[in-house]
Protein backbone atom coordinates (compact mmCIF):
# COMPACT_ATOMS: atom_id res chain seq x y z
CA UNK A 1 0.00 0.00 0.00
CA UNK A 2 1.29 3.41 -0.96
CA UNK A 3 1.80 6.08 1.73
CA UNK A 4 1.16 9.81 1.21
CA UNK A 5 1.86 12.74 3.49
CA UNK A 6 -0.90 15.32 2.99
CA UNK A 7 -0.73 18.98 4.02
CA UNK A 8 -4.11 20.53 4.90
CA UNK A 9 -4.66 24.22 5.61
CA UNK A 10 -7.55 25.16 7.91
CA UNK A 11 -7.91 28.68 6.48
CA UNK A 12 -9.80 31.35 8.43
CA UNK A 13 -10.68 34.89 7.40
CA UNK A 14 -12.71 37.24 9.59
CA UNK A 15 -14.26 34.35 11.54
CA UNK A 16 -15.21 32.20 8.53
CA UNK A 17 -13.46 29.03 7.34
CA UNK A 18 -12.74 28.06 3.75
CA UNK A 19 -14.39 24.84 2.55
CA UNK A 20 -14.05 23.39 -0.94
CA UNK A 21 -16.52 21.04 -2.62
CA UNK A 22 -14.67 18.18 -4.28
CA UNK A 23 -15.30 17.32 -7.91
CA UNK A 24 -17.82 14.49 -8.33
CA UNK A 25 -15.47 12.28 -10.36
CA UNK A 26 -12.19 12.20 -8.42
CA UNK A 27 -10.36 12.35 -5.12
CA UNK A 28 -10.76 10.54 -1.84
CA UNK A 29 -14.14 12.14 -1.04
CA UNK A 30 -15.91 12.87 -4.37
CA UNK A 31 -18.69 15.46 -4.19
CA UNK A 32 -18.25 16.29 -0.51
CA UNK A 33 -17.06 19.47 1.21
CA UNK A 34 -13.47 19.40 2.46
CA UNK A 35 -10.41 21.35 3.38
CA UNK A 36 -8.02 21.96 0.52
CA UNK A 37 -4.59 20.35 0.54
CA UNK A 38 -2.52 17.72 -1.11
CA UNK A 39 0.57 15.58 -1.12
CA UNK A 40 4.12 16.51 -0.21
CA UNK A 41 6.42 15.84 -3.18
CA UNK A 42 9.80 14.06 -2.75
CA UNK A 43 12.45 16.52 -1.55
CA UNK A 44 9.86 19.19 -0.73
CA UNK A 45 9.74 20.86 2.68
CA UNK A 46 6.39 20.77 4.50
CA UNK A 47 5.62 24.52 4.38
CA UNK A 48 6.72 24.66 0.73
CA UNK A 49 4.24 21.89 -0.04
CA UNK A 50 1.47 23.70 1.84
CA UNK A 51 2.08 26.96 -0.03
CA UNK A 52 2.32 25.13 -3.39
CA UNK A 53 -0.95 23.26 -2.81
CA UNK A 54 -2.72 26.49 -1.85
CA UNK A 55 -1.43 28.20 -5.03
CA UNK A 56 -2.39 25.24 -7.24
CA UNK A 57 -5.84 24.63 -5.75
CA UNK A 58 -6.93 28.08 -4.56
CA UNK A 59 -5.02 30.48 -6.83
CA UNK A 60 -2.23 33.02 -6.56
CA UNK A 61 -4.37 35.81 -5.06
CA UNK A 62 -5.23 34.21 -1.69
CA UNK A 63 -2.77 35.80 0.74
CA UNK A 64 -1.93 33.94 3.95
CA UNK A 65 -0.70 36.07 6.84
CA UNK A 66 -0.28 33.24 9.37
CA UNK A 67 0.65 29.56 9.05
CA UNK A 68 0.89 27.57 12.29
CA UNK A 69 1.32 23.78 12.52
CA UNK A 70 -1.64 22.47 14.51
CA UNK A 71 -2.12 18.68 14.56
CA UNK A 72 -1.84 15.47 12.54
CA UNK A 73 -3.91 12.36 11.92
CA UNK A 74 -3.81 9.29 9.71
CA UNK A 75 -6.10 6.76 8.07
CA UNK A 76 -6.47 4.50 5.05
CA UNK A 77 -8.55 5.85 2.16
CA UNK A 78 -9.54 4.80 -1.34
CA UNK A 79 -8.71 7.44 -3.93
CA UNK A 80 -10.65 7.63 -7.21
CA UNK A 81 -8.77 9.07 -10.18
CA UNK A 82 -10.32 11.05 -13.06
CA UNK A 83 -9.90 8.00 -15.33
CA UNK A 84 -11.92 5.83 -12.92
CA UNK A 85 -8.99 3.95 -11.37
CA UNK A 86 -9.10 3.39 -7.61
CA UNK A 87 -6.21 3.01 -5.18
CA UNK A 88 -6.03 2.35 -1.44
CA UNK A 89 -3.56 4.73 0.25
CA UNK A 90 -2.25 5.17 3.80
CA UNK A 91 -2.70 8.92 4.40
CA UNK A 92 -0.82 11.00 6.99
CA UNK A 93 -2.50 14.41 7.37
CA UNK A 94 -0.51 17.42 8.65
CA UNK A 95 -3.03 20.13 9.51
CA UNK A 96 -2.16 23.82 9.75
CA UNK A 97 -4.04 26.78 11.24
CA UNK A 98 -3.92 29.51 8.60
CA UNK A 99 -5.22 33.07 8.48
CA UNK A 100 -5.80 34.80 5.15
CA UNK A 101 -5.76 38.54 4.52
CA UNK A 102 -8.43 38.24 1.83
CA UNK A 103 -11.02 35.90 0.29
CA UNK A 104 -9.75 35.93 -3.29
CA UNK A 105 -10.05 32.27 -4.30
CA UNK A 106 -9.83 30.74 -7.77
CA UNK A 107 -10.40 26.98 -7.48
CA UNK A 108 -8.85 24.46 -9.85
CA UNK A 109 -10.47 21.39 -11.47
CA UNK A 110 -10.24 19.34 -8.25
CA UNK A 111 -13.12 21.38 -6.84
CA UNK A 112 -16.56 22.38 -8.11
CA UNK A 113 -17.30 25.10 -5.56
CA UNK A 114 -16.01 26.85 -2.45
CA UNK A 115 -17.51 28.75 0.49
CA UNK A 116 -16.39 30.85 3.43
CA UNK A 117 -18.43 29.39 6.30
CA UNK A 118 -19.08 30.72 9.81
CA UNK A 119 -18.60 28.07 12.54
CA UNK A 120 -22.33 27.98 13.35
CA UNK A 121 -23.09 27.02 9.72
CA UNK A 122 -20.47 24.26 9.26
CA UNK A 123 -22.87 21.47 10.30
CA UNK A 124 -25.16 22.34 7.35
CA UNK A 125 -22.52 21.18 4.83
CA UNK A 126 -21.98 17.60 3.60
CA UNK A 127 -18.50 17.39 5.11
CA UNK A 128 -16.27 14.42 4.41
CA UNK A 129 -15.35 12.29 7.41
CA UNK A 130 -11.77 13.63 7.67
CA UNK A 131 -12.91 17.27 7.58
CA UNK A 132 -15.68 16.57 10.10
CA UNK A 133 -13.10 14.94 12.42
CA UNK A 134 -10.74 17.92 12.06
CA UNK A 135 -13.46 20.51 12.72
CA UNK A 136 -14.69 18.56 15.78
CA UNK A 137 -11.14 18.38 17.14
CA UNK A 138 -10.88 22.15 16.64
CA UNK A 139 -14.12 22.66 18.58
CA UNK A 140 -15.98 24.06 15.57
CA UNK A 141 -18.62 21.28 15.33
From Swiss-Prot:
Motif Nudix box, chain ranges: 38-59
InterPro entries in alphabetical order: Nucleoside_triphosphatase_NudI, Nudix_hydrolase, NUDIX_hydrolase-like_dom_sf, NUDIX_hydrolase_CS, NUDIX_hydrolase_dom
Hydrolase found in the keyword field: yes
Required cofactor(s): Mg(2+)
Keyword annotations: Hydrolase, Magnesium
Segments passing through the bilayer: none
Gene3D superfamilies in UniProt: Nucleoside Triphosphate Pyrophosphohydrolase
Keyword set includes NADP: no
EC number(s) from the headed UniProt entry: 3.6.1.9, 3.6.1.12, 3.6.1.-, 3.6.1.23
GO molecular function, one term: magnesium ion binding
Function: Catalyzes the hydrolysis of nucleoside triphosphates, with a preference for pyrimidine deoxynucleoside triphosphates (dUTP, dTTP and dCTP).
Subunit: Monomer.
Protein name: Nucleoside triphosphatase NudI
Lineage, opening ranks: Bacteria, Pseudomonadati, Pseudomonadota, Gammaproteobacteria, Enterobacterales
Gene behind this protein: nudI
